């Protein structure tokens, strides 16, 4: 188990706040599981503009992207979105 702190970018927080409480609870549990064992949850990866490895997974109806900041011991959640690509305002 990693001892990462969990950080969410503003856009991820805004997405979470627009969800039902049940969806927020589901995502909170998934984010904590990812924080504890990030590599167990990585289903794909891509490189960002500076070459950093961004990993992602699908959790139910949500897509989550994150990266491990090993220098700061943070797991940074950079994106939470609908897995089917729909608009953030629709449920």
Model-flagged regions — what are they?
Residues 32-58:
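A short, surface-exposed loop/turn module that caps and links secondary-structure elements
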Residues 1-5, 14, 18, 25-29, ...:
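Enriched for short, Lys/Arg-rich terminal
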Residues 4-8, 38-40:
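Short amphipathic alpha-helical segments, especially helix-boundary/capping motifs
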Residues 6-9, 21, 49-51:
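Lipid interaction determinants
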Residues 18-21, 36:
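Secondary-structure boundary motif
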Residues 22-23, 45:
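Short, mixed-charge, low-aromatic patches
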């Amino acid at each position: 188990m990693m001892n990462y702190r969990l950080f969410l970018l503003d856009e991820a927080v805004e997405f979470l706040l627009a969800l039902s409480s049940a969806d927020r609870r589901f995502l909170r549990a998934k984010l904590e599981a990812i924080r504890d064992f990030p590599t167990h949850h990585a289903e794909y990866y891509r490189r960002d503009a500076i070459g950093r490895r961004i990993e992602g997974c699908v959790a139910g109806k949500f897509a989550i992207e994150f990266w491990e900041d090993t220098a700061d011991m943070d797991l940074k959640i950079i994106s939470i979105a609908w897995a089917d690509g729909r608009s953030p305002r629709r449920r």
